């Protein structure tokens, strides 16, 4: 761990632009450069570092929401922020603090919902999985999934818990239960879809007021050549302007596309492990691949357009991007479950705009023509 700290210091002294001017070298971070020392240590957490970081959502450049699965004690000699392989999965010394917090553009914590840490401090739980806001909701409710609790939570913007779906630690496949839900996305009228999930193999559709409407999907476990609507690890969901529902069928290495009522339309294969899918405002589907550790861009016919990313624990490298988000200044944020951290990338000077991860929908900034 000490050698990592020394190496990181050396690397961070060398500007990316300087590396690009030399002969040889590599393009590790695509059109971005990593922002060092982001986020900053949380006051009062000396001796601890991030747990596994499940989700990140950029509301604005100065309000970036992060959810993590508790905090872990630092090994002797390590500094805050050091990545810990597989961190946050119930390790010895884990404490449930600052599971939901907000940082500004410099990585300083500006808000923490410590009143809700107790939600996740349950035996058998492992902490929040992803965090989002409904882009069509002017009240900007905050939605958080906890897969091991089998629950979905809806909070007011100020932090009041107003609605819960699912029963704590009870798995089910009916209209009142989940089987480790993973993600959520919305139609303009507030109708929403939940990817469900690690143990269930379905997408669940709810009305704007949260009533169960329908679900679709069957298990493909044990099948060598699974067909349409058969799934294994339904890990993410995104809805396009065309109202199509794009579903990460992770273990089957593909994206399946349905209409809003569950009719199968298409599938894109040979995407190794699609962890998270994001529909950009300009109508491209971006995917974080948890096996190749790359950020991938596809047009809506499924054509591969571009990809970048390098595996590893050093700043700028990736390991298990469970969720990513882009702010209004085109900064990219990633939440890594296996490196146990969130990272911020800013566009390089002169970066090709077509290679920058597209901005997602958010309130006040919807689809572009």
Task: Identify the meaning behind each predicted range.
Residues 24-49:
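A short helix->beta-strand "capping" segment at the edge of beta-propeller domains
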Residues 71-139, 169-170, 312:
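Blade-loop segments of beta-propeller domains
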Residues 47-59, 95-98, 118-138, 170-191, ...:
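Beta-rich, blade/repeat-based domains predominating
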Residues 97-101, 151-153, 202-205, 254-256, ...:
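A short loop-to-beta-strand structural motif that recurs across blades of beta-propeller domains
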Residues 38-46, 110-121, 163, 169-174, ...:
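A short beta-strand motif characteristic of beta-propeller blades
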């Amino acid at each position: 761990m000490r050698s990592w700290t020394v190496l990181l210091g050396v690397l961070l002294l060398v500007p990316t632009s300087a590396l690009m001017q030399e002969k040889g070298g590599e393009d590790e971070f695509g059109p971005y450069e990593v922002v060092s020392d982001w986020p900053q240590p949380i006051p009062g957490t000396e001796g601890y570092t991030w747990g596994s970081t499940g989700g990140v959502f950029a509301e604005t450049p100065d309000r970036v929401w992060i959810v993590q699965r508790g905090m872990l004690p630092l090994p002797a000699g390590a500094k805050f922020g050091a990545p810990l392989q597989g961190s946050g999965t119930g390790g010895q010394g884990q404490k449930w603090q600052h599971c939901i917090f907000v940082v500004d553009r410099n990585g300083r914590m500006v808000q923490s919902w410590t009143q809700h840490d107790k939600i996740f401090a349950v035996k058998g739980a492992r902490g929040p999985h992803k965090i989002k806001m409904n882009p069509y909701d002017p009240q900007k409710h905050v939605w958080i999934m906890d897969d091991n609790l089998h629950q979905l939570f809806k909070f007011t913007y100020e932090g009041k818990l107003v609605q819960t779906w699912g029963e704590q630690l009870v798995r089910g496949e009916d209209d009142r239960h989940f089987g480790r839900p993973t993600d959520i996305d919305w139609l303009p009228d507030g109708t929403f879809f939940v990817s469900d999930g690690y143990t269930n193999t379905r997408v669940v559709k709810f009305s704007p007021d949260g009533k169960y409407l329908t679900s679709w999907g069957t298990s493909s476990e044990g099948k060598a050549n699974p067909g349409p609507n058969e799934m294994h690890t339904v890990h993410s969901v995104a809805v396009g302007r065309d109202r199509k529902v794009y579903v990460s069928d992770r273990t089957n290495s593909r994206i399946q596309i349905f209409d809003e009522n569950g009719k199968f339309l298409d599938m894109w294969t040979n995407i190794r492990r699609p962890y998270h899918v994001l529909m950009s405002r300009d109508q491209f589907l971006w995917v974080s691949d948890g096996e190749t550790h790359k950020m991938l861009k596809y047009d809506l016919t499924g054509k591969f357009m571009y990809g970048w990313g390098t595996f590893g624990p050093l700043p700028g490298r990736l390991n298990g991007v469970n969720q990513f988000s882009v702010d209004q200044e085109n900064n990219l944020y990633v939440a890594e479950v296996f490196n146990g951290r969130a990272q911020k990338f800013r566009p390089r000077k002169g970066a090709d705009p077509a290679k920058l991860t597209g901005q997602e929908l958010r309130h006040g900034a919807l689809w572009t023509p």
